[in-house]
């Protein structure tokens, strides 16, 4: 055993032993309780960041603790390898996305291995490999057969210069990110999945999940179940009588409708724009810019009157029709009723364009004014109808019932349940993704690729140039024969949304070599007992994966309908930011490692200078580590300098897993010092720790009893903290243990060996390398086996027993000292000890005790 702790040597030795033993390969075992813990698989962007380190360490700690407690544990890893960043990198570097992706995977895998993670690499999944995405294609075809997948037109962002479809994030201020051209909205055929078919189940099943309430609320709101009324405004055009249909949750305000707004893509808009150049110009303007709902929600609301009116369904009054840029054809009916008096968006729109505002609900004690919007204007819990004829005085529920009944009687509408959730459009007009297994035949139309011909393999040697989809230019990929009639045909060039890849990978981990999509091993491991990932995935990924599980269940592939029993959303890793701003307002960000910060006498930062030139930089505050703010810390540099165990220890100690973690160089130094102390104690006491003599706990001297009492008391708390995933307090417990062991005077070698062994096991899940090596070189492995599967230490309850206890001593209710008494001391003995204590004499100032209050096991209060 070396005197000095050298992390690189210790970690290399431990990892060598683990590789030789194939230590983390997991197998199904029906006789053991399983625990399947999964970190959300990373995108292979090039190198790990500290968010990855934190996520995977949390997973690893969980795995190791539960394995020591007898669970059959599994921690796999894979790569979410398709996606747009690879195409962008390919364009920038002139290499195929496949080359960039596989190089990144190789480097990031080395980094994970350097962290000492308990990953079963035999189960590695890479989503851009045909043996994985074959099953995306296979399930898509099964869903197509069942009507769960279908084709319809959808709206996309079209760059007219690059002749390509853009993702929402590639549209900047309404222009294409590369060409700068104004982006157009286009309707193109796309494939969708009927996630709406599962809306109620997705909502109801949230109740049974051990997920953060915040995530469940976000999914609940995203699904957005609404109870309302779907009805039509009658109109006549070109000799035909029709209805302009809308859906509303506020039918109680129908008498306040003063306009209707329709989407630019609404069929009525196109008809009304004939021979009206100004109207057509506005429609064209609306079709430019992004199609993201978030963009539309925040942009300026604009509209143009069409000069056409529909009839109010209850009064017959004319209602003017407008085209509004805020109305989405993909939501509801592509038309909305405008009630300016009681909808904030409609209120602003009406004020902007001088439209009538008609109050039709009131709240007692409130006065309505059109001068400015007030929150109560939209209140449906306290409001009653006014200025609404026969509906006056009705509260929300009664008004909706009555109005819906009248609309139904007139054949104009009825109550309806709707969802904010829309079917999942999976078609992407991109190269680097799962090919959609469809063949376009001029005679047979769209023909599914036969199952025996799967996978449709994506060529990996193409290099995107930003002008259209490379697959459409690849004759080798594009040209094929129709499987129905044998005619010359073309392959579908759209690929699948990358959320398809991540919707089920955890099921493939369970059976990575299966010749079917999944097999019996999947039902052994799934659902995941613990899923770990960032809150940013709360909606789309987690919702799609839940939907995918339910589809797989309904197709008879798996027995479960929810992929993850429990979810932990780890907090972000934060760091300081520093910048300089030029005359044009452009900021240049500097990495904290390149900056020297000065502090005031209270330790608060008051200034900073760049090390390279000594000139000031601005303090930008604490923010999430990111490339844009240049405030990241390279995990590889941390591992190279301090070792993986120090990086792991700091990330677990600095904050509870679900909370934000503020980076601290001093904290990293502190973690390193602590591990050196653990090693130093083992080295200094290596001979005493090698003693394996049994001992009678009852016959120990007081020093031994005291040390065992402290260690087992802390162990009890640490075990509890491991179970509730509070790893920061586990590390605190280990620090208390080391302090107690270092400070123990007179404890026998056998007691030191026992208590130091407890410390190593408590620390092991957090810092596996150094504890594994100390366990081995100090002979613990010879007694208990390797630390990988050493049994978790049991709390010796007898050791917690104390002959004496300490009570708080109060005089007239104020704490004046402490009183040691026998554990089984009688009330009389405690009272006698209290009045005989020197602190009582000091503060009683000669006055006799009038009353003595004893709270057993806690305090004694002497009243004078």
Swiss-Prot record:
Any Pfam family the entry gives: tRNA-synt_1
Positions of ATP binding: 627
Chain ranges for the short sequence motif 'HIGH' region as given in the UniProt record: 42-52
Any Gene Ontology CC annotation: cytosol
Gene3D superfamilies in UniProt: 2.20.28.290, 3.10.20.590, HUPs (3.40.50.620), Isoleucyl-tRNA Synthetase, Domain 1 (1.10.730.10), Valyl/Leucyl/Isoleucyl-tRNA synthetase, editing domain (3.90.740.10)
EC number of this enzyme: 6.1.1.4
SUPFAM superfamilies on file: Anticodon-binding domain of a subclass of class I aminoacyl-tRNA synthetases, Nucleotidylyl transferase, ValRS/IleRS/LeuRS editing domain
Motif ('KMSKS' region) on chain: 624-628
UniProt KW Cytoplasm keyword: yes
Compartment list: Cytoplasm
Catalytically driven reaction(s): tRNA(Leu) + L-leucine + ATP = L-leucyl-tRNA(Leu) + AMP + diphosphate
Domain of life: Bacteria
InterPro entries according to UniProt: aa-tRNA-synth_I_CS, aa-tRNA-synth_Ia, Leu-tRNA-ligase, Leu_tRNA-synth_edit, M/V/L/I-tRNA-synth_anticd-bd, Methionyl/Leucyl_tRNA_Synth, Rossmann-like_a/b/a_fold, tRNAsynth_Ia_anticodon-bd
GO molecular function, one term: ATP binding
Enzyme class, UniProt record, top EC level: ligase
Keywords on record: Aminoacyl-tRNA synthetase, ATP-binding, Cytoplasm, Ligase, Nucleotide-binding, Protein biosynthesis
GO terms, biological process: leucyl-tRNA aminoacylation
Annotated NCBIfam families: leuS_bact
Family of the protein in this entry: Belongs to the class-I aminoacyl-tRNA synthetase family.
Protein name in the entry: Leucine--tRNA ligase
């Amino acid at each position: 055993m070396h005197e000095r702790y050298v992390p690189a040597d210790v970690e290399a030795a431990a990892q060598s032993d683990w590789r030789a033993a194939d230590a983390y390969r997991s197998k199904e075992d029906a006789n053991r309780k399983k625990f399947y813990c999964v970190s959300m698989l990373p995108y292979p962007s090039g190198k790990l960041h500290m968010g990855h380190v934190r996520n995977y360490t949390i997973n690893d700690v969980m795995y190791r603790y539960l394995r020591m407690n007898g669970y059959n544990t599994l921690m796999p890893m894979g790569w979410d390898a398709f996606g747009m960043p690879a195409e962008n990198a390919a364009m920038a570097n002139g290499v195929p996305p496949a080359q960039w992706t596989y190089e990144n995977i190789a480097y990031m895998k080395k980094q994970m291995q350097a962290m000492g993670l308990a990953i079963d690499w035999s189960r590695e999944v890479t989503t851009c490999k045909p043996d994985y995405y074959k099953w995306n294609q296979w399930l898509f075809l099964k869903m197509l057969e069942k009507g769960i997948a279908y084709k319809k037109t959808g709206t996309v962002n079209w760059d007219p210069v690059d002749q390509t479809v853009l993702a929402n994030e590639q549209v900047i201020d309404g222009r294409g990110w590369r060409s700068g051209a104004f982006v157009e909205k286009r309707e193109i055929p796309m494939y969708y999945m009927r996630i709406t078919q599962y809306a109620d189940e997705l909502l109801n099943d949230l109740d049974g999940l051990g997920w953060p309430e915040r995530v469940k609320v976000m999914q609940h709101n995203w699904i957005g179940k609404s109870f309302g009324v779907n009805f039509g405004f009658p109109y006549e055009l070109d000799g035909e009588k029709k209805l302009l249909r809308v859906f509303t949750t506020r039918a109680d305000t129908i008498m306040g409708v003063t306009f209707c707004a329709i989407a630019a893509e609404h069929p009525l808009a196109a008809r009304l724009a004939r021979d009206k150049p100004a109207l057509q110009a506005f429609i064209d303007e609306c079709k430019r810019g992004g199609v993201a709902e978030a963009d539309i929600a925040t942009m300026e609301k604009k509209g143009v009157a069409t000069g056409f009116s529909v009839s109010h369904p209850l009064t017959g009054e004319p209602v003017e029709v407008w085209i509004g840029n805020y109305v989405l054809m993909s939501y509801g009916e592509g038309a909305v009723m405008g009630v300016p008096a009681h909808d904030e968006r409609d209120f602003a729109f009406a004020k902007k364009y001088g439209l009538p505002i008609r109050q039709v609900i009131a709240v007692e004690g409130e006065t309505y004014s059109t001068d400015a919007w007030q929150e109560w204007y939209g209140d449906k819990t306290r409001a009653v109808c006014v200025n609404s004829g026969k509906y006056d005085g009705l509260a929300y529920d009664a008004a909706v019932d009555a109005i819906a009944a009248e609309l139904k009687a007139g054949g104009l509408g009825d109550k309806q349940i709707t969802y904010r959730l829309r079917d999942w459009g999976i078609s992407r007009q991109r190269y680097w993704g799962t090919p959609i297994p469809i063949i376009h035949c001029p005679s047979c139309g769209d023909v599914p690729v036969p199952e025996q011909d799967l996978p449709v393999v994506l060529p990996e040697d193409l290099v995107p140039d930003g002008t259209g989809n490379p697959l459409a230019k690849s004759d080798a990929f594009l040209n094929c024969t129709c499987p129905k009639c044998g005619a010359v045909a073309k392959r579908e060039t759209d690929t699948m949304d990358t959320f398809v890849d991540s919707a089920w990978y955890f099921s493939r981990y369970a059976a990575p070599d299966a010749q079917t999509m999944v097999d019996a091993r999947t039902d052994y491991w799934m659902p995941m007992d613990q899923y770990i990932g960032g809150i940013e995935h709360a909606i789309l990924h987690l919702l799609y994966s839940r939907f995918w599980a339910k589809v797989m269940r309904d197709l008879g592939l798996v027995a479960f309908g929810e992929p993850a029993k429990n979810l932990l959303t780890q907090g972000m890793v934060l760091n300081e930011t520093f910048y300089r701003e030029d005359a044009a307002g452009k900021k240049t960000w500097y990495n904290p490692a390149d900056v020297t910060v000065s502090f005031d006498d209270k330790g608060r930062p008051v200034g900073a200078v760049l090390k390279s030139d000594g000139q000031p930089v601005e303090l930008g505050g604490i923010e999430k580590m990111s490339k844009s703010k240049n405030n990241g810390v390279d995990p590889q540099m941390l591992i190279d300098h301090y070792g993986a165990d120090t990086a792991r220890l700091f990330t677990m100690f600095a904050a509870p897993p679900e909370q934000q973690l503020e980076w601290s160089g001093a904290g990293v130094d502190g973690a390193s010092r602590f591990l050196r102390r653990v090693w130093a104690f083992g080295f200094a006491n290596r001979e005493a720790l090698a003693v394996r003599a049994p001992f009678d706990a009852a016959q120990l001297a007081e020093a031994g009893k005291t040390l065992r009492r402290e260690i087992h008391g802390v162990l009890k708390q640490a075990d509890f903290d491991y179970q509730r995933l509070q790893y920061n307090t586990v590390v605190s417990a280990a620090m208390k243990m080391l302090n107690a062991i270092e400070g123990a005077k007179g404890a026998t070698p056998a007691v030191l060996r026992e208590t130091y062994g407890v410390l190593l096991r408590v620390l092991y899940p957090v810092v596996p390398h150094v504890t594994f090596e100390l366990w081995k070189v100090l002979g613990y492995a010879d007694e208990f086996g390797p630390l990988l599967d050493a049994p978790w230490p049991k709390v010796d309850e007898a050791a917690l027993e104390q002959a004496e206890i300490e009570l708080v001593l109060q005089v007239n209710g104020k704490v004046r000292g402490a009183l040691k008494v026998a554990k089984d001391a009688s009330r009389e003995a405690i009272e006698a000890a209290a009045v005989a204590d020197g602190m009582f004499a000091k503060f009683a100032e000669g006055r006799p005790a009038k009353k003595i209050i004893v709270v057993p096991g806690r305090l004694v209060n002497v009243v004078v």
